[in-house]
A protein has these predicted regions:
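Extracellular/oxidizing-compartment recognition motifs
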Residues: 1-224
């Protein structure tokens, strides 16, 4: 699989591989990276669902300090081949016009500004994608270590003031926050990220400049 942008793929609801921000950054006019995965354990008899979440990433999303967008292209694209070998022989399922485009639960996703996620189960078919690339002549296998989860860290200290809670992990790191939203219905959680606290204990974000570094989670009507 590869993409002009970033992708995350899953089969039957299970994420494929451990890599984040796949396929990784490259100089898109010359090359695009791709990944291969062994997915036999994720397949089952009967119908299977392959789903790919596609984001703008470095290809056409916000990039560099000048807040530029669409540096390499106007919109993201994705390409994949699912190769199946069984008693019937070998056959390829290739990305193409028969792929449905679904309404995404992600209202936004970007490296600088974070994510907006709607947990209302939205998955309506809204059309067939036109941004599918099947030409892989310019794709190269990555030679660098993939970006993946290395360690899980616990909150060291939590301080609450009104409806704001400061979660201090005790050190700076590159990572994401995991929450349990199962107790929420029709509510919204906003998580801001920062490296420093102000003297009064509030979050200091001036050094982020225009980056929002914020996750917004909209819980649905049912607990999940």
């Amino acid at each position: 699989a590869t993409a002009l942008g970033v992708y995350e793929a899953e089969i039957n609801g299970v994420k494929i591989g451990k890599q984040m921000f796949a396929p990784g950054y490259s100089y898109y006019p010359r090359r695009v990276l791709y990944q291969t995965y062994e997915v036999s354990a994720l397949l089952r008899e009967g119908a299977n669902t392959l789903r790919v979440y596609l984001g703008q990433g470095w290809y056409c999303g916000r990039f560099l300090c000048e807040n530029k967008t669409q540096i390499y292209g106007e919109k993201p694209a994705v390409s994949w081949i699912l190769k199946i070998e069984d008693a019937a022989g070998v056959r390829d399922i290739v990305s193409g016009e028969q792929t449905d485009e679904l309404e995404s639960p992600y209202g936004y996703a970007g490296e600088y500004d974070g994510e907006i996620y709607f947990a209302d189960g939205r998955s309506a078919v809204i059309g067939h994608p036109v941004s599918i690339k099947n030409e892989l002549d310019f794709a190269l296998e990555p030679t660098l270590t993939e970006v993946a989860l290395q360690e899980e860290m616990e909150v060291k200290e939590a301080k609450q003031t009104g409806n704001v809670t400061i979660l201090d992990f005790g050190q700076n790191f590159a990572g994401i926050v995991e929450i349990d939203p199962s107790f929420l219905t029709n509510e919204t959680i906003t998580i801001r990220h920062g490296e420093i606290l102000n003297a009064d204990g509030s979050l200091y974000t001036a050094n982020l400049r225009k980056a929002k570094a914020t996750i917004v989670y909209h819980a649905g009507a049912e607990k999940k």
